[in-house]
Structures are given as structure tokens and as C-alpha cells.
């Protein structure tokens, strides 16, 4: 039984972002149900969108909604699903990349306010350290 779940373009992104000083183990894969989670980065900084962006177009052309589970990343292809886990409390959420950014130095991913608050402590303001994993659905290749 062969299962394929990695997109070649994501493979290139993962390896181009991993340096000899990076603590990320890019070969770390977890399987839960029909999904695999491939570690992309630990200790990444996440922030969230301000409400003023609601209703504006994202780089993918979609209209931004701060109540949906979406995110911005500088490199992931639009439509990529990632699991974002708050390293302080272990809470996680799955978001779909539909925009580019963040453009603040040191930030890796911008989450919608809904996604950010789902995994934040207390009222969920500011930024947090997160683990980012690529999400792929396992597709059975047997006919």
C-alpha cells in the first residue's frame, strides 16, 4: 500500500527554509486519522490580523474574514493547510493559507483573529510562539 501526501513545491520550501542552525527536524511526521502532519517549524512567531482588514481582498483574491480559519505566510502556496500549535498551552487549530505576509520582522505567520483566539491564552492578544505543521490528507492509492 503506497500513500502519497507531499507536494513537491512544499518539499522545496521546507528544505530551502532549513539551515544547519535550525533546530527543526524536518523529517518529523505524525499521523492522526486520515491526516499527516509534517513539522515545518518550531518556535515560530504568530500574530493576528487587525479587524480593519475584514472585507478586503487577500493576495489570493479571496475576501478576508477574521472569523474564518485562514492565515498569511510568505512562501506556502495558497490553499495549503497548516496546523498551528501554541507552544505555551498545546492548543492547536488548522488554517488555510490565503494571503501573503506577515511583513513584520520576526513573524512567521499571521492568523485570522478567530484562529489566533482559538489557541491563545486568556483573551488572545499580541503574538505567540507556535509550531507549524503541514497538513495533508492521506489518500488511499489502491483502486
Features from the language model and the residues they span:
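Secreted/periplasmic proteins
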Residues: 1-143
Amino acid at each position: 500500500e503506497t500513500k502519497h501526501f507531499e507536494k513537491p513545491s512544499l518539499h522545496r520550501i521546507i528544505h530551502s527554509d532549513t539551515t544547519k542552525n535550525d533546530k527543526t527536524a524536518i523529517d518529523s511526521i505524525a499521523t492522526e486519522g486520515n491526516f499527516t502532519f509534517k513539522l515545518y517549524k518550531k518556535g515560530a512567531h504568530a500574530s493576528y490580523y487587525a479587524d480593519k482588514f475584514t472585507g478586503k481582498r487577500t493576495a489570493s483574491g479571496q475576501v478576508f474574514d477574521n472569523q474564518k480559519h485562514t492565515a498569511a505566510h510568505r512562501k506556502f502556496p495558497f490553499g495549503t493547510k497548516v496546523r498551528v500549535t501554541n507552544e505555551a498551552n498545546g492548543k492547536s487549530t488548522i488554517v488555510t493559507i490565503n494571503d501573503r505576509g506577515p511583513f513584520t520582522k520576526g513573524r512567521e505567520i499571521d492568523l485570522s483573529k478567530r484562529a489566533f483566539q482559538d489557541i491563545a491564552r486568556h483573551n488572545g492578544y499580541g503574538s505567540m510562539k507556535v509550531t507549524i505543521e503541514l497538513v495533508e490528507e492521506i489518500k488511499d492509492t489502491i483502486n
